[in-house]
A protein has these predicted regions:
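Sec-dependent N-terminal signal peptides
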Residues: 5-15
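Repetitive, compositionally biased segments used for assembly/scaffolding
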Residues: 21-119
Length: 119
């Protein structure tokens, strides 16, 4: 039974990653190095995205699940956490479980879209 499900699981993962939304992040040392400036809000209704940090690459199954990478070259997106909400272009609420992660403000999805390499 599990062997039959493997192609479906592989297809699901492939489709999910082909949607082009970054999940591997690197935290820059300065805002000039980042493509997205992030602010962690104090209330969930203030957020654009509810984020859950994961520890294993295999856990990255959808948007809102972020894995903090050690090196910028490993990341899909480089972020910088700002101190003031007004300086952010993405506001996040940190959640405890994978199931809670989700977009609240769909208009902000393009901030985490992976750009296709130019030919």
């Amino acid at each position: 039974m599990i062997i039959r499900a493997l192609p479906l699981i592989a297809l699901f993962v492939l489709i999910n990653f082909s949607l082009g939304y970054a999940q591997k992040i690197f935290q820059a040392d300065s805002p000039d190095e980042a493509s997205v400036r992030v602010f962690a809000v104090e209330e969930p209704e203030q957020a654009d995205l509810w984020v859950c940090f994961v520890w294993e690459e295999s856990e990255i199954t959808r948007t809102g699940l972020w894995m903090d990478m050690r090196f910028s070259r490993e990341a899909d997106v480089i972020i910088y956490f700002v101190d003031e909400e007004k300086d952010a272009n993405l506001k996040i609420w940190l959640v405890d479980t994978i199931e809670e992660s989700k977009w609240i403000n769909d208009a902000k999805k393009s901030l985490l879209q992976i750009k296709s390499p130019e030919k």
